[in-house]
């Protein structure tokens, strides 16, 4: 997909971004990429999408130097998904977003020194020694703005009021299915606010890639989400192939697509099974694990792996499909189709499932787009965001 590339100055940035959102209906902020552009300075690339016609554009702007800091106006008032995206850029690149109410680090510790995706970042072990103490924690957020004279000001906001009831979930908790900490403000059964603490398993993959060749980076994509290893590697080899002008045969395209879909089924079965287990439906969990084994068997015959496959290569595949792959994939589809009704019988249509899930945390289409909630949740709200169509 070729993007319409737009360059904006610091002075025009806030006004023109509002026009893109309100007048040209670029209502979905796909991502924000913080970048060190060398002599140009630090800056960001914003990928925007018009959800009515799926048109995309990229907006590039260079941060302004103010009192020794690099600053860009926040877009959180236009797209709510900018909240965590801007905090990520601040954490790794060091750009301060003016008007953002919570400019704290998101992934790295609060006492981490420097911003690792800058080209001048000190990589020596002495700069950031392995910490032997708990992470310092503040009860305040930080907001940056410019005063009437153009100088940078800092305002602190309290995270919690005296009346807030705060429940700390994680970083190790059976309900999170991963290392994640959530400071949760609740009122009875209603969650009023969540402050996420991420990065407990952050491995610095993007920084590692700066010193690698393209083929060396492939294995790391599989580990971004090992339940979507095929798709993540597919995304990386795809952009490399496009940049190099490599044309793929239809056979390779079909094989990659089928492998992606098989792993998507594998991932969904694990999700459904774990959700059922969390609600106490152990039978549904075992059914999902039983059927997931059949999917993994088909992929293993060709790739040799059941979790991390290492199958896609730049320009092609590790090897051709197993002679039995086509027949076994057809058998798998025939086997799985009637199982959908079985999942509904034992779990989906169960009154306990409905009581626990229906009406809990609903989001309409507008909010899904505003917060960047894609996938099944976004589609369920009426947002047609499936890129396969």
List each model region and its residues.
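Active-site bordering "gate/hinge" segments
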Residues: 110, 148-177, 185-389
């Amino acid at each position: 997909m070729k993007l319409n590339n737009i360059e904006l100055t610091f002075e025009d940035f806030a006004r023109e971004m509002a026009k893109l959102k309100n007048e040209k209906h670029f209502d979905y902020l796909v991502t924000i990429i913080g970048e060190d552009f060398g002599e140009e300075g630090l800056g960001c690339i914003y990928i925007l999408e018009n959800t009515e016609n799926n048109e995309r554009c990229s907006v590039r702007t260079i941060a302004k130097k103010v009192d020794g800091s690099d600053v860009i106006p926040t877009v959180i008032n236009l797209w709510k998904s900018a909240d965590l995206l801007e905090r990520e850029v601040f954490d790794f690149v060091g750009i301060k977003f003016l008007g953002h109410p919570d400019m704290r680090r998101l992934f790295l510790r609060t006492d981490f020194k420097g911003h690792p995706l800058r080209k001048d970042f000190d990589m020596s072990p002495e700069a950031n020694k392995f910490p032997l103490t708990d992470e310092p924690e503040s009860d305040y957020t930080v907001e940056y703005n410019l005063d009437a004279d153009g100088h940078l000001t800092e305002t602190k906001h309290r995270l919690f009021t005296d009346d807030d009831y705060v429940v700390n979930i994680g970083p190790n908790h059976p309900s999170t299915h991963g290392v994640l900490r959530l400071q949760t403000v609740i009122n009875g059964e209603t969650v009023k606010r969540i402050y996420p603490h991420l990065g407990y398993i952050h491995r610095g993959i993007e920084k590692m890639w700066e010193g690698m060749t393209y083929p060396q980076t492939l294995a790391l994509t599989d580990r971004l989400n090992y339940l979507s290893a095929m798709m993540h590697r597919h995304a990386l080899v795809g952009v490399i192939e496009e940049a190099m002008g490599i044309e793929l045969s239809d056979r390779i395209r079909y094989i990659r697509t089928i492998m992606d879909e098989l792993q998507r089924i594998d991932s969904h079965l694990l999700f459904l099974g774990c959700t059922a287990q969390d609600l106490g439906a152990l039978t549904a969990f075992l059914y999902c694990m039983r059927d997931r084994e059949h999917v993994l068997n088909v992929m293993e015959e060709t790739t040799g792996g059941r979790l991390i496959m290492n199958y896609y290569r730049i320009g092609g595949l590790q090897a051709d499909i197993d002679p039995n792959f086509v027949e076994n994939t057809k058998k798998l589809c025939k086997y799985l189709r009637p199982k959908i009704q079985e999942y509904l019988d034992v779990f989906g249509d169960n009154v306990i499932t409905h009581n626990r899930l229906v009406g809990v945390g609903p989001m309409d289409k507008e909010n899904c787009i505003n917060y960047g909630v894609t996938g099944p949740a976004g589609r369920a709200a009426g947002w047609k965001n499936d890129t396969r169509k």
